[in-house]
Structures are given as structure tokens and as C-alpha cells.
């Protein structure tokens, strides 16, 4: 089957055990290790939820690395890294960077919501907790108060800029993006983004909802007009763009996490077992703070028979 197609959870649940059982019996030790390059926003999701459950259910050991999705896809496309599995926070970006040369299919398995997390004891945090609209409070905040991700390294960064653009329209504040600039400071990684909030270096950060949950920080989700969580607003999101250093224009789109097993994977069977495990355990993914709507999982490209049957 090619193109975009929904795949029922029943299909995954019905055969997940068979695939995991088969690969668990055949692979042990180093051969059972699965190298995963994953979006940085999934660090706690994988380490605290998915990895322990998957390793308990199989003889496989995950070897995850976490990077911004733009960075990890570049590491694969330029031959620097050769993982078994890639997981991106932007499904379209994964297809654009990996299809044809490195992968033939991608499974979309989760969504997320953009917003702002904050430290309640800070001046900005107190205003947010009191109900001041985030954008008014942010404009008034002291310089370098709000941490944001680097748009050149991961989708969280360029979605943040797109959200500011869409928020300007939503709130009839045409200069909002420029007005927010003094209060924001760009961080090179998603892990540092929240580490600096937790240590008090910054009062807030623009993040995905699961990241705030991971760090036990209050979270204010942006409205549907610019939280990139409402598929029915896809055309509206697409009106916001970000242009990369190489001139590629990226349009806003709903947040969708996608994964694939690379064509040159060293452990193809293990990688497929892990992908199936993700798709077959939506409640586990939800417990980690992500969303799994009824429209997921779905896929692009021709799924391997082992995943589709």
C-alpha cells in the first residue's frame, strides 16, 4: 500500500506480540541492540516510558541518541550516523530528508501541542498564573526571560517563530513578533532549554506540552490558532513560514511525530519490532504527555509486510 493510509490499532495489537516474540528469540546480546536517533522532545518519553517497557517485553536493548529533528535527519542524510530507527517531530521533514535515498516509508504515531511553561515564583510566572494573556506578559518581560529553541536545529524552534507570527494576527498585534524578541533567548538544544528554566536562568520557555510534563512545570497551551495541534487548521498553519539557511521554505503544519527503519539498518527486525511497539501502545505514549488521536497511526509509503499485516 502506498501513499497516506490509516492503519488500525487492532492490526498492530494483533501482531505486535508475534513480531516481538520472534525477534526476541532470534536476537541476543549486541545483535539485539537497536540504535535509535530520536527527536530531543522525546527524551523523557523514551527513557522513562517506552524504553523500559520495550526492553522488559523483549530481549532487545535500545541505544537512543537525542537531537533536534533537523540535526538528526542531517546526520543520517550526510552519512555521519547510521541508526536503525529515526524518529522526527516533523513527519514532513522526515519524508523530505530521508525518502528515496535512506527510507521508503514512515509511520506517524503521535501529536503534540505548543505552548509556554514557566516558573510560578518569577515575575513573569506570577502574571501567567494570574491569568494575564501570555503574549502581553511576555512583551513586558525583562530581556532574555523566555527560552526558545534554535529554528536551525529543530522543528520546535521554527514552530515557535511561526507561532509568534500567527499570534500577531490572532491578537491583532502586528508588531508582536518584533516586540517579543527582546524577551526571548535562543538555546542550542531542547535539553538545555528546560534545564535553564529549572535552574532559574530563565522564567519560561516555549515548549511542547509533554516537555513541561516531563519537568513538572506549569504549562499554558497556545490557542488552536497557533498551537499546531488542530489538523483542521492545517491551511491556516501553512500561512506561516520559515526559511532555512539553504533557502528551503518550511510551511507551518500540525505537529506529527513520525518514525521509520532505515534502509541500511543493521538491525532491521529489531527496528521494526520497536516501531510496532510504538504503534501498538498508544496509552503509553499518552501517559508521556503526547496526543494520539483516532486518526493515528497512519503512514506514508509502502509499509513492510511485517508492519502492515
UniProtKB/Swiss-Prot annotation:
Predicted to be exported by the Tat system. The position of the signal peptide cleavage has not been experimentally proven. Pfam families: SBP_bac_11 (PF13531). Keywords: Signal. SUPFAM superfamilies: Periplasmic binding protein-like II (SSF53850). InterPro entries: ModA/WtpA, TAT_signal. CDD domains: PBP2_ModA_WtpA. Residues 1-32 form the signal peptide. One of its GO terms (molecular function) is molybdate ion binding. GO terms for biological process: molybdate ion transport. Belongs to the bacterial solute-binding protein 1 family. WtpA subfamily. This is Uncharacterized solute-binding protein VNG_1595C. It comes from Halobacterium salinarum (strain ATCC 700922 / JCM 11081 / NRC-1) (Halobacterium halobium).
Amino acid at each position: 500500500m502506498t501513499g497516506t493510509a490509516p492503519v488500525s490499532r487492532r492490526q498492530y495489537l494483533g501482531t505486535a506480540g508475534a513480531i516481538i516474540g520472534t525477534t526476541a528469540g532470534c536476537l541476543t546480546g549486541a545483535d539485539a541492540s537497536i540504535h535509535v536517533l530520536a527527536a530531543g522532545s522525546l527524551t523523557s518519553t523514551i527513557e522513562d516510558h517506552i524504553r523500559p517497557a520495550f526492553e522488559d517485553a523483549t530481549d532487545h536493548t535500545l541505544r537512543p541518541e537525542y537531537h533536534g529533528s533537523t540535526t538528526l535527519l542531517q546526520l543520517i542524510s550526510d552519512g555521519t550516523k547510521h541508526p536503525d530507527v529515526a524518529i522526527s517531530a516533523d513527519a514532513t521533514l522526515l519524508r523530505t530528508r530521508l525518502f528515496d535515498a535512506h527510507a521508503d516509508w514512515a509511520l506517524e504515531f503521535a501529536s503534540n501541542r505548543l505552548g509556554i511553561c514557566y516558573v510560578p515564583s518569577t515575575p513573569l510566572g506570577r502574571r501567567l498564573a494570574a491569568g494575564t494573556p501570555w503574549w502581553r506578559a511576555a512583551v513586558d518581560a525583562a530581556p532574555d526571560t523566555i527560552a526558545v529553541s534554535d529554528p536551525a536545529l529543530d522543528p520546535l524552534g521554527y514552530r515557535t517563530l511561526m507561532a509568534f507570527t500567527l499570534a500577531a494576527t490572532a491578537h491583532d498585534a502586528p508588531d508582536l513578533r518584533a516586540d517579543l524578541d527582546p524577551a526571548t533567548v535562543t538555546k542550542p538544544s531542547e535539553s538545555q532549554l528546560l534545564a535553564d528554566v529549572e535552574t532559574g536562568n530563565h522564567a519560561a520557555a516555549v515548549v511542547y506540552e509533554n516537555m513541561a510534563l516531563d519537568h513538572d512545570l506549569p504549562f499554558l497551551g497556545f490557542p488552536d490558532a497557533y498551537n499546531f495541534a488542530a489538523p483542521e487548521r492545517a491551511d491556516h498553519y501553512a500561512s506561516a513560514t520559515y526559511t532555512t539557511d539553504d533557502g528551503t521554505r518550511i510551511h507551518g503544519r500540525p505537529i506529527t511525530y513520525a518514525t521509520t527503519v532505515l534502509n541500511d539498518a543493521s538491525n532491521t527486525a529489531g527496528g521494526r519490532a520497536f516501531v510496532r511497539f510504538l504503534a501498538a501502545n498508544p496509552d503509553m505514549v499518552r501517559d508521556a504527555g503526547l496526543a494520539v488521536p483516532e486518526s493515528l497511526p497512519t503512514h506514508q509509503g509502502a509499509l513492510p509486510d511485517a508492519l502492515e499485516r
